[in-house]
Amino acid sequence: MKIGVRAHDYGKHSIEGLASLLREEGYDGAQLALPKVFEEIDSYEDIRLSHIERIRRAFEKNRVEIPVMGCYMDLGNPDRSVREYAVETLKTCLLYAKEMGAGVVGTETAYPRLSREERAAWCPYMMDSLMRVMEEAQRIDMKLAIEPVYWHPLAYLETTLKTIRMVDDPAHLRLIFDASNLLEFPETTDQDAYWNQWLASVGTYIDVMHIKDYSLGKDRAYQPKQLGEGILRYAEISRWLHENKPDMYLLREEMNPASAGADIAFMRRM
């Protein structure tokens, strides 16, 4: 497997400085959300082609790949103006990502944490937004990767499969698989069976995996953990990777730079 990180876990840096830092830390690649990670860029509206060229050159020089350009948008929001902004921003980022040499543009399908009823109500809005973004992805031949999250419109395996079938374009619609964002009931879920079900159903669509770990504190509060010290069970995911996609990118999220070495070692053992 190739090992990467969500780069803004290291804070904001200059373009050249970040590329050098990631190489020194031992990563093969990174997920870049440009306004969150570069000192030169504070919003998506700030991005210029000169930035994109600098990023491409700096990361090529340091031999750090960009498997994901992060552009996480509120695609399912019932507010039309919010959705319009999400769609137009993603379309623009598809162009930037292609120029930058990124593998995919990654997004979730909402911002807020939704109730079960809200997830269902937001689904039609999500699909409308997604179909419009996919028109641009197809036009410029660039991949969009959507990330299922159990508290968003793209919440469950059934919804994910329905979305894949409706778009019907595996060349341009891909998935980011984040196991921790799919584990709604960790206390009662047979993780081995659950991951096998997901991977058997949509594994061919997965381009990247996000890797993180956590525990549940008081009132089930989410508490990030070092890899291997929380409730995630990666054995079946690891087996599937070796059998099916041994060259896939594993991107560490919620990285604590102080424990980067241990987390990188964990991912290399997967």
Locations of the language-model features?
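Glycine-rich, proline-tolerant flexible connector loops at the mouths of alpha/beta enzymes
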Residues: 33-55
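Catalytic domains of carbohydrate-active enzymes, especially glycoside hydrolases
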Residues: 18-35, 101
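Active-site-proximal loop/turn and secondary-structure-junction residues that shape catalytic pockets
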Residues: 9-11, 34-36, 73-75, 109-113, ...
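Hydrophobic faces of well-ordered beta-strands that scaffold small-molecule active sites
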Residues: 3-7, 30-32, 66-71, 105-107, ...
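Acidic/histidine-rich catalytic cores of soluble enzymes
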Residues: 30, 121, 131-231
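Short, acidic/polar
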Residues: 12-22, 85-94, 191-199
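Conserved, mostly hydrophobic/aromatic
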Residues: 22, 30, 59, 86, ...
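Active-site acidic/histidine proton-transfer and metal-coordination neighborhood
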Residues: 16-17, 53-54, 58-65, 75-177
